[in-house]
Amino acid sequence: GPGLGQTAWSEQMIQRVFWEAEKRDVPVIMDADALNLLTQLKLSSKLPKNLILTPHPGEAARLLNTNISNVESDRFGSAAKLQKKFNATVVLKGSGSIVCYKGNGGQKWGLCNSGNPGMATGGMGDVLTGIIAGILAQGLSLKDAAEAGVDLHSKAADLASLETGEVGLTPSDVISELRSLLRYD
């Protein structure tokens, strides 16, 4: 998603990714432009079975054909609607990021209590997507990778903001703090 664009080439690329993901039984994480394409192309019938969506409230509103204030006024309900509509694990980013997934007995939720307003800047979602992808590559489930990724991302942002402050927090600051959270010394 990050940097994908929204062209005819992008549409072909995303359809190819879906096809390859199903053929190889590998997960797909969709963010940014990929989510916008998902809204425009009505691809929900062709989605891979191992899917994580990481929308911010604006992207969630487009995916649900509603407005941002409706998403923000019922974040749990919005995450649940996205999970059901796309049969995906959903990370609804924002203050109190929510992970919604299909578990035994129905939908389940995780709520992140870490993070700060400095995370509302370009590139932070790209970092989150990369963290989740790295965790998935280690063999964790979609739910576990999404929850661990959100937790690491927000805790790293909190650590970085102690040093730099929330204003001007950059994705690079967050990446630097990830190292300290992942050390096993």
Give a label for each model feature.
Residues L43-S44, P48, N104-Q107, M119, ...:
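N-terminal loops that bind phosphate or other acidic moieties
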Residues E59, S78, G130-I131, A156:
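A general alpha-helix detector
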Residues R62, T121-L152:
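Short, small-residue alpha-helix embedded
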Residues G1-S114:
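Glycine-rich phosphate/dinucleotide-binding loop and adjoining beta-alpha-beta core of small-molecule
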Residues I68-R75, G139-E147, G165-L169:
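Short, charged, surface-exposed loops that flank catalytic or proteolytic processing sites
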Residues L63-L64, C112-M119, T129, A133, ...:
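Short beta-alpha connecting loops at secondary-structure transitions
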Residues K155-D185:
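Charged C-terminal helix
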